[in-house]
C-alpha cells in the first residue's frame, strides 16, 4: 500500500522537509509514504477563493493515480484517535488500495473535490499552519503503522 499526501504548496521551510523525510524513511516499502506537492493558484490573479480552490482541485486530481482511495483533510472531518487511525489504516491495507490524503491551500479544498472523497479527516480542532499539517500527518501515519505492527515507537 502506498500512502500519498497531495498537498497544495511548494515552498516549505527546511525543517518540514527534514521531518517529512525522517518519517517517510521509517515506513517500510509495503506502506510507503509519498509527498506530491501541488502548485498553488497565485493569489494575485484577481480570482475569487472558489475559483482558486477549483483550479487547485484540478491539479490535485491530476496528481493522483487512478483508483486511489481519497481522504480529504478538513476541519469538519472525522476526528480519530491514533488507535482508531491505526485500525482504519489496517482496513485500507486489507482493501488493497493506495490511499491519498488531500491537503488544501490557504483557502482550503474545493467543495466538489471534498464531496468526491471517500472520507474527511480532521487532524485537530486547532487551526494548523500548512507546514505543520504535513509533519503532523506524516508522524501520525507512522505512529498508526507502529501500532498496527506492534512496533515499540508507540508506547501507550
UniProtKB/Swiss-Prot annotation:
It is an enzyme of class 2 (transferase). Pfam families: SPOUT_MTase. InterPro entries: Alpha/beta_knot_MTases (IPR029028), RlmH-like (IPR003742), tRNA_m1G_MTases_N (IPR029026). One of its GO terms (molecular function) is rRNA (pseudouridine-N3-)-methyltransferase activity. Keywords: Cytoplasm, Methyltransferase, rRNA processing, S-adenosyl-L-methionine, Transferase. Its main location: cytoplasm. GO terms for cellular component: cytoplasm. Its EC number is 2.1.1.177. It catalyses: pseudouridine(1915) in 23S rRNA + S-adenosyl-L-methionine = N(3)-methylpseudouridine(1915) in 23S rRNA + S-adenosyl-L-homocysteine + H(+). S-adenosyl-L-methionine binds at residues 73, 104, 123-128. It is found in: Cytoplasm. Specifically methylates the pseudouridine at position 1915 (m3Psi1915) in 23S rRNA. Homodimer. Belongs to the RNA methyltransferase RlmH family. This is Ribosomal RNA large subunit methyltransferase H. It comes from Bordetella parapertussis (strain 12822 / ATCC BAA-587 / NCTC 13253). The lineage of its organism: Bacteria, Pseudomonadati, Pseudomonadota, Betaproteobacteria, Burkholderiales. The gene is rlmH.
Amino acid at each position: 500500500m502506498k500512502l500519498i499526501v497531495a498537498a497544495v504548496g511548494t515552498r516549505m521551510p527546511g525543517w518540514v522537509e527534514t521531518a517529512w523525510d525522517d518519517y517517510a524513511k521509517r515506513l517500510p516499502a509495503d506502506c510507503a509514504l509519498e509527498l506530491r506537492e501541488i502548485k498553488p493558484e497565485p493569489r494575485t490573479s484577481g480570482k475569487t477563493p472558489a475559483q482558486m480552490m477549483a483550479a487547485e482541485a484540478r491539479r490535485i486530481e491530476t496528481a493522483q493515480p487512478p483508483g486511489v482511495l481519497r481522504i480529504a483533510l478538513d476541519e469538519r472531518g472525522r476526528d480519530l484517535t491514533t488507535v482508531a487511525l491505526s485500525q482504519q489504516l489496517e482496513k485500507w491495507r486489507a482493501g488493497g488500495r493506495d490511499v491519498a490524503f488531500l491537503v488544501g491551500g490557504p483557502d482550503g479544498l474545493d467543495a466538489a473535490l471534498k464531496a468526491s472523497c471517500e472520507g474527511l479527516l480532521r487532524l485537530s480542532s486547532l487551526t494548523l499552519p500548512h507546514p505543520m499539517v504535513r509533519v503532523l500527518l506524516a508522524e501520525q501515519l507512522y505512529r498508526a503503522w507502529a501500532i498496527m505492527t506492534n512496533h515499540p515507537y508507540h508506547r501507550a
